[in-house]
Regions:
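Conserved subregion of the PPM/PP2C metallophosphatase catalytic domain
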Residues: 1-68, 73, 90-204
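Conserved long alpha-helical elements within nucleotide-processing catalytic cores of c-di-GMP signaling
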Residues: 75-83
Length: 204
């Protein structure tokens, strides 16, 4: 996600309250107020859809944009079933103001669903255009990378704050009692937030 982008990828239009995405191959650019999102996904081999799923939604005013990037345990039909479940869960919870509540609700409902023990690592982000802040929650997912245009440097996007004791930030769907933290970063013009699954690191 960045404030500026040049790409030959096809553009998508996001309707208000729509949850866009899935686990199919795509190379799309979506412009939202204050931020541009590029989503690129390719399944392994000849598979039509993989275990990596992506979703993007926006409030009616466009001030708030949310994304969920997940790596589902399993492939093929099992991953597709879980992807559909995650999409429905995100649609039901997209209006929650606090991101931690959204993540915890999705986790509880996924853990309670009959998914045969399947789970997913996930990264959830909420972009507020009025403050230029991105709030992130990480559920056992690879750490995103942050590029600062002003200094032309990359760094891991992590927080060192401690939260409450107990099970924290585990993959979604393992245990309904897990709590999730969140932290915010301010993005400036030209900054880039790179979010990915372990498929990227494994292919390098």
């Amino acid at each position: 996600m960045t404030t500026t982008i040049e790409s030959t990828s096809h553009s998508e239009r996001l309707s208000c309250m729509e949850v866009w995405g899935g686990n199919n191959e795509t190379d799309a650019v979506i412009d939202r107020p204050g931020v541009t999102c590029r989503v690129r996904s390719r399944a392994y081999g000849s598979a039509g859809g993989g275990g990596d799923v992506y979703f993007l939604s926006s409030c009616a005013s466009g001030r708030l944009t949310r994304f969920l990037l997940a790596d589902v345990c399993g492939h093929g039909e099992s991953a597709a079933e879980t992807a559909i479940g995650l999409r429905d869960l995100m649609r039901r919870n997209v209006n929650r103001i606090r991101q931690k509540q959204l993540v915890q609700s999705v986790n509880r409902e996924l853990a309670a669903a009959d998914m045969s023990g399947r789970f997913a690592t996930a990264l959830v982000g909420t972009w507020m255009s009025s403050t230029a802040r991105m709030t992130l929650s990480n559920a056992g997912h690879p750490t995103p990378l942050l590029y600062r245009a002003a200094t032309q440097t990359w760094s891991e996007c992590v927080t060192h704050e401690t939260t409450t004791v107990g099970m924290q930030n585990m993959p979604l769907g393992i245990d309904s009692r897990v709590s999730y933290s969140e932290f915010a970063i301010k993005l400036k013009p030209g900054d880039l937030l790179l979010c990915y699954t372990d498929a990227l690191s494994e292919s390098v």
